[in-house]
């Protein structure tokens, strides 16, 4: 199934997963860019950077198979297999970035907006009763099992 065919299914979990991939790039870039502030904004930029690495393992299940991680980390990551749990973690990460406005308005707002959109897609998928469907392009639905 191509990416276009995946989007044509109108499953909001696919939209959420691909928005999550964009969040990986944006959180990584903005986390690094805002590390050079000489204020408490450094804390929020470090949390944004950590969020990008969490999202990598949440959205690309293939990495849990090929990267050496602890069983505790694997168990933690496997909690986020449902739409509601993914919506919850994305909303949690978004709230942290929205709180960065307290310190100073910065480009971290873009990360907060995109994380909120991803949480919204996953929440809509859950509310519509759509099961979580992982993108084949990102290692879902059988690709990760082919490595073993």
UniProtKB/Swiss-Prot annotation:
It is found in: Golgi apparatus membrane. Keywords: Glycoprotein, Golgi apparatus, Membrane, Transmembrane, Transmembrane helix. The chain crosses the membrane at residues 12-32, 38-58, 85-105, 107-127. Coiled coil: none annotated. One of its GO terms (biological process) is vesicle-mediated transport. Pfam families: Cg6151-P (PF10233). It comes from the Eukaryota. One of its GO terms (cellular component) is Golgi membrane. It is a multi-pass membrane protein. The keyword Transmembrane applies. Glycans are attached at residue 11. Signal peptide: none annotated. Golgi membrane protein involved in vesicular trafficking. Belongs to the TVP18 family. This is Golgi apparatus membrane protein tvp18.
